[in-house]
UniProtKB/Swiss-Prot annotation:
GO terms for cellular component: cytosol. Its EC number is 2.2.1.7. One of its GO terms (biological process) is thiamine biosynthetic process. The gene is dxs. Catalyzes the acyloin condensation reaction between C atoms 2 and 3 of pyruvate and glyceraldehyde 3-phosphate to yield 1-deoxy-D-xylulose-5-phosphate (DXP). CDD domains: TPP_DXS, TPP_PYR_DXS_TK_like. Thiamine diphosphate binds at H74, G115, H116, S117, G147, G148, N175, F244, E327. This is 1-deoxy-D-xylulose-5-phosphate synthase. Belongs to the transketolase family. DXPS subfamily. Mg(2+) binds at D146, N175. GO terms for molecular function: 1-deoxy-D-xylulose-5-phosphate synthase activity; magnesium ion binding; thiamine pyrophosphate binding.
Length: 583
């Protein structure tokens, strides 16, 4: 590899290069990104597609004096490489290493913490107005990409920005993809002559469409945008996965998230785990339910791939609805389906469900509609980090009246939970983690629908301590209790409503450890304490869960161990509680 990229320590070095050197810089950036993702994994496709665009941005604008705000962060590995982080990129997504997305605490060149989509325009307009009020100079650029024009927040920002007359620059990295192909009318409109009329009608000067891999054309368009005194949209057409044949050949996601892998002799070599994931297992039981009952439909906000729904979409094309990166719409659309007699299952990540909290309350729970929420990535998600942790769903959903909140311990729990939820006259949540399925403990049955309440995994004849768990932590609790006399293990299974009889029995053991992979503030442990207080039950209780902090990226297994949420940690907590001490 040439030494060109090794001489780039900041964007000023990009501006100092002769223009004829920029194509080589782009080539080296792609080689670095492919190599990095091969070693540690990551969001490959969007970053490869945005290489020329990011080089052109740093050629024309002067970061950090000019603020560059990227939507999501999927597309930003070249930006990281050009802003002084190349020597640490091998730590990408690892504990203590480079963040998976963008974070201003990592670099002054990251003007916006970006992990969720559709935030860049609103934030950029705020930055521009704030700078104007403070008398600060400098340009502000919002870079949209990976489906940013399928979400409502972007249009709220465009509406406000177009009416403001402020010189906001919006760069649309149009690769026709979010994770998979974009859906709906807007992405189709962008590839027509009406795109100009659309943006000009919103009050923007429209520049484009520009070939997003033609550096001279990009630089000309960005310089024109920089010189404008009013809002501008630069529309760049790019190819997600450009420069890496396996990504370009991947028609579903264009190499959205890949690695680790090896690229040898023109061939991609990847190790593939044979274990089934919770997502795949849930998709299978949902497929069975859809085959049995034509009223059952699936809804997802741009998560066909992530929630393992592609096979369902192929089998039931008219009953699987990908609505784009539009979580609020997904929930209210599901409410409408339910009100018309369908049985919608809204498949959504825990972290993205946060974006539709009002719709859950107002549009689903208040009218009492039987929507089922399949909440994927509940708990720790590992390398995707703080913006994607699923550690707040129990605490936020538990207070909602008549919403039943299920959490499977093993894959065998999914079918009876879904059957129970589909038969219920109210809303239900089935929350399951990222990762592979644990084995069903010996002698344990999953039960049959309708499920009712908690499940004893281990019941001591003379109990002196009970481990109460939610989800797969029951497996660790069983291991922790093995060989400990008088220890019981209760899988709460449903965080709301509680199985009061089982939990009060647990409390009468005198010592209770409640373990959950989520915040303890308002979570299952809080619910258990509320129950004990209401019944005047005096037990020693220890709550185990996430700290009062945002959990960063890292290995989820290590993070569980750090919080005592493995077998050894739970055993240690139980023994300390019995001894009357702390941790």
């Amino acid at each position: 590899m040439s030494e060109l990229l090794s001489r780039i320590g900041s964007p000023s070095d990009v501006r100092a290069l002769p223009e004829e050197a920029l194509p080589l810089l782009c080539q080296e950036l792609r080689e670095d990104i492919i190599s990095i993702c091969g070693r540690v994994g990551g969001h490959l496709g969007a970053s490869l597609g945005a290489v020329e665009l990011i080089v052109a941005l740093h050629r024309v604008f002067h970061s950090p004096q000019d603020a560059l705000l990227f939507d999501v962060g999927h597309q930003t590995y070249a930006h990281k490489l050009l802003t002084g982080r190349r020597d640490r990129m091998h730590t990408l997504r690892h504990a203590g290493g480079i963040a998976p997305f963008l974070d201003p605490r990592e670099s002054p060149h990251d003007a916006l913490l970006a992990g969720h989509s559709c935030t860049a325009v609103s934030a950029a307009l705020g930055v521009l107005e704030g700078r104007r009020q403070q008398g600060h100079r400098g340009h502000v650029v919002a870079v949209l990409g990976d489906g940013g024009l399928t979400g409502g927040l972007t249009f709220e920002g465009l509406n406000n920005a177009g009416g403001s007359s402020l010189p906001l620059v919006v760069v649309l990295n149009d690769n026709q993809m979010s994770i998979s192909a974009n859906v709906g009318a807007i992405p189709a409109l962008l590839r027509t002559r009406e795109a100009r009329d659309f943006f000009e009608g919103l009050g923007f000067t429209y520049l484009g469409p520009v070939d997003g891999h033609d550096l001279p054309a990009l630089i000309r368009a960005l310089r024109e945008a920089r010189a404008s005194s009013r809002p501008v949209v630069v529309h760049a057409l790019t190819l997600k996965g450009k420069g890496f044949p396996p990504a370009e050949a991947d028609t579903q996601t264009r190499g959205h998230a890949m690695g680790p892998y090896e690229w040898r002799d023109g061939k991609l070599v990847r190790s593939r785990g044979g274990q089934r994931t919770f997502s795949e297992a849930f998709a299978a039981v949902l497929e069975d339910a859809m085959a049995r009952d034509p009223r059952v439909v699936a809804v997802t906000p741009a998560m066909l791939e992530g929630s393992a729904l592609n096979a369902l979409k192929a089998r039931f094309p008219d009953r699987v609805h990908d609505v784009g990166i539009a979580e609020q719409h997904a929930v209210t659309f599901s409410a409408g389906l339910a009100s018309a007699g369908a049985r919608p299952v809204c498949c959504i990540y825990s972290t993205f469900l946060q974006r539709a909290y009002d719709q859950i309350i107002h549009d689903v729970c208040l009218p009492g509609l039987p929507v089922v929420f399949a909440v994927d990535r509940a708990g720790l998600v590992g390398a995707d980090g703080a913006t994607h942790q699923g550690t707040y769903d129990v605490a936020s959903l538990r207070p909602l009246p008549d919403l039943h909140l299920w959490s499977p311990m093993v894959g065998e729990d999914l079918a009876p939970m879904l059957d129970t939820a589909l038969a219920a006259p109210h809303a239900s949540v089935i929350r399951f983690p990222r990762g592979t399925l644990p084995p069903l403990p010996e002698g344990l049955g999953a039960g049959e629908a309708p499920l009712r309440g908690a499940r004893w995994l281990l019941r001591a004849e003379q109990p002196r301590l009970t481990l109460v768990t939610l989800g797969p932590l029951g497996i660790a609790a069983l291991e922790a209790a093995r060989g400990e006399p008088g220890w019981s293990v209760l899988d709460a299974r449903c965080a709301s409503p509680l199985d009061e009889a089982a939990l009060l029995e647990a409390g009468r053991s005198g010592h209770v450890v409640v373990a959950e992979e989520g915040t303890t503030r308002g979570g299952l442990g809080s619910a258990v304490l509320e129950l004990f207080a209401a019944h005047g039950l005096m037990a020693r209780v220890r709550l185990m869960g996430m700290p009062d902090a945002f959990v960063p990226h890292g290995d989820a297994r290590v993070q569980r161990a750090e919080q005592g949420l493995d077998a050894e940690g739970l055993r240690r907590a139980g023994l300390a509680l019995l001894a009357g001490g702390g941790r």
